[in-house]
Structure formats: C-alpha cells, structure tokens
Amino acid sequence: MGGRKYFGTDGIRGRVGQGVISADFVLRLGNALGRVLVAQRGQDGRRPIVIIGKDTRISGYMFEAALEAGLVAAGADVQLLGPMPTPAVAFLTRTLGVDAGIVISASHNPHYDNGIKFFSAQGEKLDDATELALEAALDVPFTTAESEKLGKASRAREAVGRYIEFCKASVPRAFDLRGVRLVLDCAHGATYQIAPLLFRELGAEVIGIGAEPNGVNINAGVGSTHIDNLAAKVRETRADLGIAFDGDGDRVLMADDQGNPVDGDDLLYILARAWKDEGRLRGPVVGTLMSNYGVEKAFADLQIPFLRSNVGDRYVHQVLTEGGGVLGGEASGHLLCLDRATTGDGIVSALQVLVALRNNGQTLRQALKGLVRVPQKTVNVRLGNVSAKATVQAGSVQSALADAQHAVAGRGRAFLRPSGTEPVVRVTVEADDATLMQETLDRLSAAVREAAA
C-alpha cells in the first residue's frame, strides 16, 4: 500500500467528524470515485452505476447523502441499498452488473466511528490502478458534470430478497431448520432485518436480540464482541444454540446449548472436519498466528494441512488463494468459505456450520469433542517512546524468546508481535499446562520490559 495518502489496507476508518471521516471529505471522495468510473467507461454512453450499503450507525445517513451527491455530480448513477451486511454488498456488486460498490461501516467498532470501503465490479477490493487513480482524483477540485450528464439516484428494492436467495443457495436444497430453536444476536447492526427473516424462512424458531437499532447502540453490549449476552439468552430460553454477528455482518460466533461460547477457531475445526469427511475440503485450512495450538494439533491428528497467516482476514484470504484452499478463518469469527462466497460472510458461514451439524446428527458441543484447546494468554507490553520493532529485535529479547519457545516446544507456542501503530509489543504464550504457560509468559514479558527500559 506504499504511496497511499488517504487509504489503508481496507478503505478508511476513524472517529466521525475527524480527519477523513467527515462529510466534506466523503463528498469529495464520492465525486472522485465518480470521475474515475466515468473516465474508465470512456465513450460507451452509459453512466457508471454505484451501489451504496451501510450499517445502522447514525452517521451513515450523513455519509450516504455525501457519497450520493458527489457521485451524481460526477455523472454516476447511484442505487441505495440501505442497511446491508458488508458481504451482501460484495455479492450484489458482483451480480447486479454495476461498476462499484461502497460500504459505509466501521464493523465491530462503536457507533462514534465509521468508515468507507469499496468493491470492484467483481465484488472484490479495488485493484491498485483504480485505487491510485482515486487517490489522484481526490487532489483535483470537486467537479460537476454538465446538467444532461448528471447521474440519478434510486433505491434498490430487490436487494434484500436477492441476498437471502444467495444465502439459501449456499446450503443443500433440502436443508431446513425445522425443530431448531436458536437465538440470533444481530448487534443492532446490518443483519438485523435479513438474518431473522432468513432463519425463519428456513424453519427455525428464532429468538432475536440486538435487532432494534437506534443509530447509537450498534455493538453496544451485543453482538460477536459481547458473546456473554448471547450465551445468557441461550441458557434463559433453553435454545439449541445461539448465533452472534458483528455490526456489519462479516463475523460470526456461536454459543452451544449450555451457553458455552464457540469462537472462530471452534467453528473452523467443525467445518474442516465435516468438509474432509464430505470430500469438500481442498488445499490447506488457514488460520492465523493467534489460532489456538489445540486447533493445529487437532488438524494434525486428522491429517488436515494447516497454515497460519498474519492476523487479519485479508491475510487469511491471501494465503488461501496462494495455496488453493477454500476454508480459513480467525478466532474473532471472520470465516472464509471460498467455495460459497468471495469474502467473509457471517450468515453464510453460520449456515455452513448448521449444515455440518445436521449432516452429522450432532450438537455444537458434540461436534467439538475432538478439539482440546490449550491455555493461551497475550500481554500487551507498553514501551514508552521506544520502537516496538527495535525492542523485539534486541539480542536479550531474542534470547528470551528462544528460551520460551524451547520451554513450550511440542506443547504450545511463544511469539512476539510488535504493533505497527503504537509503542506496544504483544507477548503471546500458549501451552497444554496453565502453570507452564503463565511462568513462560511472565519471563518473556519481563525480558521485553527490561529491554525497553
């Protein structure tokens, strides 16, 4: 991403009203994208079409209007989707024959943050050439096309139905959820309409929570970042299981019938084992540096190839693509089922897990009996003004890391992650014995603190 002035690896995100997360910048951003798309279309006579989806945070109205005005002024048509999960926008961009898609969301962040991300006509991240052209266009003054070349705006009326049918098509035609009582936590976010409707159409008895957005309650004590809320509701209602999404619907976590949390590592194990038995699994399964060592051991026992990427679903996607794999994810609930969706999709991933359970006649608890997780803990060591990278590379720290890795060899892992944005080193140790894990973590953390002193 070298040379980028405005964009990170996943669009822009931040506090509303500060920096680029402001109405005036987003107005210019819409105009810049419109001009780039008009230029790419050349002289074919058709105005480019851009779809815009958002989550439920109150600032979405402001940014939706700003993007719409900027795009229309540049000569692009706009179709407004309203509240829509991020993966749904990716799917609709790919299948509606439009030129680009935009999501207004800050995912699992609080309501006072927001962000903008883009999809190409293929429903994927913008290519480098388009992104660089967009950056350059932002440095050119706002442009308004001649009146006869201005764009139009409309609402996409059939978007919800299209996406629901896509989700249903990701499971076998005969699959249904009749007789299943489940709790759905929609984080007061983008899935609040679609998810309950879909699961009810499949026959489930749905108990909904986190499905009453008011603009400022997205992710507030609900959703996949507050799984205890879901777990308590499952126990209270004696449900068969619970499903929690995050604010923009690209993450999913679950709770079993006893209210025990089931995270992305657990779900990855369930899917990998089921898909191997079905002959659906191709290539390696991909987790991240933070995937529990118990998952790695379980996959080794099942003779399932397992690779680790850096933390972040985009890195999981990259390693999967390079290795020809179809299944990956991280503990936070970003799951990639690339034979069903091109991006992480919480609803589609949840459906794949439910199909696996139904095919094997198992509950969530039963499906996890072969997975023995090991104690894992991460400590953030703050360094003051010292470079995190330099601290990790210090000889004393490297020696302490080697000692830690030797101490847990064959029983766990020890590793360091310097933050790229703040003076922090993240120290992680896991081992099959909690005392060994804690003692090793204490020694390694102390070495990092001493090196930074």
Curated annotation (Swiss-Prot):
Keyword entries, A-Z: Isomerase, Magnesium, Metal-binding, Phosphoprotein
Details of cofactor binding: Binds 1 Mg(2+) ion per subunit.
PTM (free text): Activated by phosphorylation.
Binding site for Mg(2+): S107, D246, D248, D250
This enzyme's EC code(s): 5.4.2.10
Catalytic function, reaction form: alpha-D-glucosamine 1-phosphate = D-glucosamine 6-phosphate
Cysteine pairings via disulfide bonds: none
Sites of Phosphoserine modification: S107
EC category name: isomerase
Reported function: Catalyzes the conversion of glucosamine-6-phosphate to glucosamine-1-phosphate.
Family: Belongs to the phosphohexose mutase family.
Protein known as: Phosphoglucosamine mutase
Gene name of the encoded protein: glmM
